[in-house]
Amino acid sequence: NNISIKSEKKLPNVLSPDEIDKLIDFYNHDLFISSRNKTIIDFMYSTGCRVSELINVEESDIDIEEAFVRLEGKGSKQRIVPLGSKVLINLESYLPLRNKDRKSKNNKLFISKSYKNLDRTAVFRIIKSTGVKAGIHKELYPHILRHSAATHMLEGGCDLRTVQEFLGHSSVSTTQIYTKVTKAFLEEAFIES
């Protein structure tokens, strides 16, 4: 089981759990757009999904009762991802606002205020602008939520195989980049203590 890591790969940027909370908690569920943005950020972090997976999730892919979502990843590979209690609460608050006064038959979970599909650039804008408004002084993009989810899972003691399944990586060597991030985190924590 000799797995080598390509060392020229840049380590992914990661947000702290506090920064993740700042992003999610920036919004409330008072209005549709605010609720949608809050739920998008929480959903991306909680499921570790890619932008392409997020914009293609349909309402029928969510099972609130059983607390899971069906995601379609790269190469049309499907995976089932559990939904934690926090993201479930956000989904339960978002869905009635999403479906109120529905003027279209769009089945996508996350839609624009004109009931159209969200595209990748819209998601990039949401993440970037939320970071600025929430006072997070880092370059933000949707994939940072996926990187953060994987890193936090490993830091919390999750094994590499589970993280691999969670992210939908076909090879564990792809997932191993996060062990380097975690190692860097541990070294930094050790130096600071």
Label the model's feature ranges.
Residues 1-193:
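Conserved catalytic core of the tyrosine transesterase superfamily
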